[in-house]
């Protein structure tokens, strides 16, 4: 997500954390929803919008260890997002909220002729492979495979993700 947008507004309510954002060139849209059921504990007293810099947030989250318990709290008085990582030690980071105009982005109703389910690391690896050749990729779905392709003036690359137990 942070590859496309830097500053974002998360809309948080008792059921979910939602992000809808456009990249600066108005070419790509991010539509992300994280349901409350994904958390061990989730408490929201009232719906709130929180604007943050994703790169700064990501830098904090990268400090998390597998054994850490992550707690995120909004401090409205100090205008900060408190991020706590707790295991053997308790590490607390306070991320300043930013002021942003809350633009409503209409999510288009799209229908796709194909549905592919796979593990995210497989897509990540394929995209990283394509990055060697080009800054853009194409996804091509065939009957029993998903292809991730890239080409430049001189080079091209292709990764095939065949239909199996993981795709």
Regions from the PLM with identified roles:
Residues 1-2, 8-132, 140-167:
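DNA polymerase sliding clamps and clamp-related checkpoint/processivity subunits
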Residues 137:
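Polyanion-binding surfaces on beta-sheet-dominated domains and ring/shell assemblies
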């Amino acid at each position: 997500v942070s590859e496309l947008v830097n500053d974002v507004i998360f809309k948080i309510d008792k059921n979910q954390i939602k992000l809808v954002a456009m990249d600066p060139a108005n070419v790509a849209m991010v539509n992300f929803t994280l349901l409350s059921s994904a958390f061990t504990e989730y408490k929201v007293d009232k719906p709130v919008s929180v604007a943050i810099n994703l790169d700064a947030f990501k830098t904090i989250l990268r400090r998390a260890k597998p054994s850490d318990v992550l707690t995120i709290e909004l401090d409205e008085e100090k205008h900060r997002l408190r991020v706590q990582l707790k295991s053997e030690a308790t590490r607390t980071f306070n991320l300043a909220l930013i002021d942003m105009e809350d633009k409503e982005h209409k999510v288009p109703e799209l229908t796709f002729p194909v549905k592919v389910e796979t593990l995210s690391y497989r897509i990540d690896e394929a995209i990283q492979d394509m990055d060697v050749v080009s800054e853009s990729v194409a996804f091509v779905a065939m009957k029993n495979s998903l292809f991730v392709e890239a080409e430049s003036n001189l080079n091209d690359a292709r990764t095939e993700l065949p239909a199996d137990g993981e795709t």
